[in-house]
Every structure is written in C-alpha cells, then in structure tokens.
Amino acid sequence: MNWELYSSPLRVFWRSKVWDEKTSTFTSDENLKIGKMVGKRRRPRPKRSIDLEDSTEQLISGDMVTFPCSVCYRELNKARNFLHKKHHNALSMLGFQWMGGRQPKPKLVSLHRECIISNLLRSSTYNEKVLHNVNYAFEFLWKKQVPSYFKLCDKVGETSTYSPNSNHLMIKGIAICSNNNSAWKAEPNCKFTVVNDFGDKANVCFFGLFDSHYGYAAADLASKEFQVLLLHQLSIQDPSYQMTAEQKQLINSFDTVFREEYRAREEAFSSTYKTFRTSRREYEDTHKAFAKAFWRMDRLLRLGRNETSRVRWSGCSALTCILEGGIKNPHANKDWEKTYQQGSTSLPFQKTPQIISGVLHLANAGNVQAVLCRNGKGFCLTKEHSTRNTKERRRVLYSEAVISSDDPYGLLDGHIKTTRGLGFHGNLRLKKSIIPAPQTISVPIDDLCQFLILATNGLWQVLDKKEVTALVITLFHAYKETHVPRPKSKPWPPIGLLSPPDSNIRVLFQYQPENEDIMSTADGTKGLSDSIYAEAYTHQGTFSPKVTPYDPCSTKENSSLPTIDSKQENEKELCIKNFYKGAAEYIGCELVSAAIEGGSRDSITVMVMFLNGSEYHRLT
C-alpha cells in the first residue's frame, strides 16, 4: 500500500528485524563507504533466529515503533520524543530554525542568547520567566549532557485497562487505559462512562471522559449523573428514548433544585447558541439537550455533595459523546448482496441504495479532546477551552479575570489553565470565568472512519493530533504482525469503479464555532457523496445473520434455527471482536506510555475505539 497517495505527512514505519535482513534499495553514504572497504574481510555474524515471543517482547518495549514528528517529520520512538521536543523548543527560544538535526555552533548559540537577553532587558515588558527559559534553552544546546531538571522519574505507577463489551454495529473494539502518573499526581482524577443501548435504543452508545481538578468529587458525580440528565432531555424531545424507573426517580429528586425561575434561565442559556455550516435542523434538539444537561449538572455540583475542602471545591473538564448507528433501507441492501453473490460482474451503481452508517454527537467543555481518523487523516473534533485559546483568553479578561504569567500561556487567577468546565463553585471569583457552556458538534460516521481517540490533557500536552494518529496506525500494524489469528482486510473494488474517496469529514451541525482551523471540512454541497458507492460496495461482507437483531428498521426477530454457517460466522465475529479489543488495549497502553515518556505532568486517560473503517486496507 502506498501511504503517500493520501497522507504523506503521516507516513509511518515499523522497523522489525525482518526488514533489517533485507538489502536497502536506496543509495546512501553507508553504501559508498562499504564499497571502499572491499579488501577488508569481516567475520560474518551468526544470524539470530526470530520467533514470535522475541518479536512480541520487542513490540511491548516500544523501541521498534516510530512515528513522525509533527514539526520536522523525523522518525522518533517514544524514548526519543521527550528530548526531541525539548530540542525544538530550545531552538525556537533562541531564534534558530530547524537544521536537520545538526547542532548550532556554541559561539553562535552564545551570541543569540546575549542578543535576546539584551533586548529583553531594554524592553518595558521585562519578564523574569522568559529570562529563565532563555537560560534553560542555552544550557540545553550548549551542554552535551542533559540537565538534571529535564530528566524524568522512572516509577510512574501501573496502567489500568478496562475493555467494556459493545454490541454496537459500528464499534469493533473499545478500551480505556489510565495512569495516575504518580511522579506528578498523588491520586487518580479521571472518570469515564460507557453505556450501551443508551435510552433503550439499539445501536446508540453513550461514552464520556471527565477529568477532575482539585479533587475527584465533581468528576465522580458527573460520570454517574450526567448521562441521566442528558437522557431526560432527549426523552422530552424524542419519545423513543426510554428511561428506567430508577432514572426517573433520580430526576424527580431534583425537582426542588430545578424550579421555574431556573428553567427560564436555562431556556435562555440554551437558546443563545448560533448554528454553523449546516441547514439540517434535526440535530439542533440534540445539541440543546447537551447544553441543558451541562447546565443542570453544573447546578447540581453547586450543592457541594461529597466535597471535602472548605476553601476550594472540585471541578472537571468533560467530553461526552453519543454514537448513533444503523443501516438505511437494509432490505434493499440484502437484495443487492444476493444479486452480487449469484455471479453478476456488473454493479448497478445507479440503483445501489444509499447507506449512512451513523452520526457522532460530541459536547466538550475543558481540555479533554477527541480525534477522529478518517481515511488515514486525523481530525480534532473538539476545542480546547484553556488560556492557550486566544478567544477564551479574551473572554475571561472581559469578565474581569486575571491571567498570571506563571505558565507559558498563563493561569486563570493564578490557579488553573481551564476556562470552561463543570463545578469550581468553591471560588466565586474563579467560577465567574469558568462557565459550563459546551462546544457541540455532529459529524457523520461512515466506513472510511477508522478509529476514535478520546484523551485527557495528559496526552495532548505531549503529542498533537498528527503524532497521535500516526502512532496509532503504526501500533496497529505492529499488533497485527505479532498476533495470529487476525481478521483479513476486506478487498476494495477496482479504482476505476469508484470515485476518489474524500479524506475530509463534513460537519452536520455545530454550535459556537470559535476556532475555524480546528478541523478540515469538505464542501457542504459535496459532503460524503463521493464515497456513497464505495460504502455500498464495501458492505458486501457485513450482512451477517448477527446483524439482524440490531437492525433499527426491522420489527421482526430472526426466528430461524442456527445453522453451521451461522455458528461459524458467530465464531468469526467473536474472534474479530477479541482481536480489536486486544488491539485497543495494547494501543491505549502504548499511548499512555508515550505520554509519560514524553514528559507529561498530568494523569493520562485514553479511550481507544475502533470503527468499521479499521477493517479495510487504509488502516490494515
């Protein structure tokens, strides 16, 4: 497969011993040097046998897995990522450009430092922290040894893994991996939630991450009660969402909190949002439900339940998602599959029914972010609400808040970087700036969408979306090579039969688009129409008997007796599920390890979710 055809910056390599045994086809300086030393004989080294256990040990160590740096596109492994990023920061601080890995001359480094310090002392905006950063960068480039304050602690605790079962049509495997990063954090501060058949609806899954600040009470309550608040709002707008008796009792217990005057303010809050990039209004109610659920969850945290501090109560950043899936007009799809299996070589594309796999709704407030990989390209679906965001800085400064200079991007009132979230009611001045208004967005999910990554700030402060996407693809290749049995990649049709696949995603509905460069989007009129025929063709192997009970359009149950073919198909589906679940666990742990080795100073929680697109050649 030629990776350069669709994503040249995301070229990934996995250097194994088998590759080292092959002769390189590229001309290099090493080949020229070998040619000059023909007269010298070297004793041949005994070849070491390669077995599966040895390869798995190397795979687990992570040294053989590389990914490209998003700045210079140089191949890095996890161990080199930390110092490599420090090298980039030091060069940038002293005014140097990337020199292809070459070190600038010491005299030139000294001259740059003296010039920067001289200009800094003469300026009216003198900052002691900038002076320290210049000196640190100078020491990093001047000294051959790494300064002691750059080194990491070896013991960071164990990574816990949780793999919930999912019967969703579009989810192949899911895993949540978490590490407290005990070198910097004393206790765990992240909670997660995964709910299958959300609202008693098939192929509707709710999942979310809640990263706490100043304690775990807010994140713990939000992980338990937010889904109930959201389900209540959705059930009001759509009766197909059903609530259990226990959930209704919980909602009724909050009647004394949500009175009429509060509901009037809530309605005004949810109606002030502006729509963006869409004329499809059917998702507006879903986004209003998210907004009201965030507002109500923040009001419940104001009660101070389970809070232990008398000075400052806890808060949390939240990322919540609803994945709706299904097959449109499934009976027509089965007829088309039957016609194709009878030996027909021509495909009537004009009569092929349109298949829409599903829609992903997201709502985030804070610094928990999500990246969707579609056709080998990563898209950030969330917006970071922190002092790093220029518009967020402008908003909090307009609310008479103070941003200190204790951090490269400042701290809100000298305490925290986050500018939106749930809770933070202990400090009234801080709460005035930290609002529970979420950023919401809806995007279509089709068979070109390969995986979804949800992670807390501990991962994103070390790796960006391009590096995470490339690393996940590389790790998936490595896992596939060392684990047998593995599912076979489904064949793609000849290129001439299909339109060029669109690598972008289309925004179906979005509130408050304050950052235009957060995501690349296709033309609204074009959308996903280029890949409709590709979807119809690639679904030829997905119409198994197991899919029938989960079909939302079908009202009949499959009452036929199980056959040998159906049993084999069920065993095959179970094997595939186990494979993707294991891959999600392995990749999640490796992402956590990469963040820790990259110098993360926060706890890390990563949710890895493989979608239908991971079955095809674009990823496998």
UniProtKB/Swiss-Prot annotation:
Pfam families (alphabetical): PP2C
Domain annotation PPM-type phosphatase: ranges: 173-611
A GO molecular-function descriptor: protein serine/threonine phosphatase activity
SMART domains in UniProt: PP2Cc (SM00332)
Similarity remark: Belongs to the PP2C family.
Protein name: Protein phosphatase 2C-like domain-containing protein 1
